[in-house]
Amino acid sequence: MAGRSAARRPRGDREPLGPRLRAPRPAREPRQSESRAERGLPPSQRSSVRSAASGHDRSTRGAPAGACKPRVKKKVRPRSSQSEKVGSSSRELTRSKKVTRSKNVTGTQVEEVTKIEEATQTEEVTVAEEVTQTDNMAKTEEMVQTEEMETPRLSVIVTHSNERYDLLVTPQQGNSEPVVQDLAQLVEEATGVPLPFQKLIFKGKSLKEMETPLSALGMQNGCRVMLIGEKSNPEEEVELKKLKDLEVSAEKIANHLQELNKELSGIQQGFLAKELQAEALCKLDRKVKATIEQFMKILEEIDTMVLPEQFKDSRLKRKNLVKKVQVFLAECDTVEQYICQETERLQSTNLALAE
């Protein structure tokens, strides 16, 4: 240090220096040290110096000539086989745990996806059903509307005495347009005048042909039709009441006949002791014959009734009542025949036992 300080020149005696130059770094050598041929080559093709200690090639770029020694890799001791086994086993355990977790996660995801799919399918089915119901309802409404639009209707004003009825005539099944029969039935419902006693007049003409279309008669919406006829005939009402009473009596006798038929079924099935069957069959036969006589009396009363031709309702009711009583008489004959068969079977059995 003393020598250096003594060798220094005084500040004023120093020679003027030029611009300060930066000294080159000790670890690198200037770019001019590399040859132009090497500079132009890619790094992979440049010349390298193999380190004597490490045995690896090191690039000579940036290394000063004979300045520093190249770095030497430390020798690493080889791992023991036991540590390698422990490491491999721990890795396998970790991998198995990860796989198990991933499987669990995958299973949970699959369940969630399944639930979502089921919920989606249920919602789709519900929406489809609602859409189907809505479509069906819409179609039904459209069909009803189209039927109403397609069905020809006719509004008619019917006058009866001092009363007025606004009627809407529609055709019955099988008819494409309303006919006189449809109008007459509607008038009967509205006024109470029976159809046989109606006289419908339109433009001075009586409507007698029941199958004639109203359009063929020149009827249009708002046309007027006059009704002539009484709501009820007192004389016919008396005859209808008689027929009604006879019908009620016939139904009561028919109910009694059903009870006799049940008694016969009990005897046939053996619900009664054999010693009492013969006597029970005789009593049952007498009851059936009495029932037949009651039905015959009703027929006689019906035959004695005299009904004029204009009493069409009474005559029709009498005809139906006669048919009903004849059906009851046929049932009586069937029961009586069964009683005779059962009596003969019982007698043959008793004879066989006596022999």
Curated annotation (Swiss-Prot):
Source superkingdom: Eukaryota
Post-translational modification: Ubiquitinated; mediated by SIAH1 or SIAH2 and leading to its subsequent proteasomal degradation.
InterPro entries: BAG_chaperone_regulator (IPR039773), BAG_dom_sf (IPR036533), BAG_domain (IPR003103), Ubiquitin-like_dom (IPR000626), Ubiquitin-like_domsf (IPR029071)
Comp. bias (Basic and acidic residues): 26-39
GO MF entries: adenyl-nucleotide exchange factor activity; phosphoprotein binding; protein-folding chaperone binding
Subunit structure: Homodimer. Forms a heteromeric complex with HSP70/HSC70. Binds to the ATPase domain of HSP/HSC70 chaperones. Interacts with NR3C1. Interacts with the N-terminal region of MAPRE2. Interacts with PPP1R15A. Interacts with BCL2 in an ATP-dependent manner. Interacts with SIAH1, HSPA8 (via NBD), HSPA1A (via NBD) and HSPA1B (via NBD). Interacts with SIAH2. Interacts with ESR1; the interaction is promoted in the absence of estradiol (17-beta-estradiol/E2).
Descriptive protein name: BAG family molecular chaperone regulator 1
Native source organism of the sequence: Mus musculus
Lineage, uppermost ranks: Eukaryota, Metazoa, Chordata, Craniata, Vertebrata
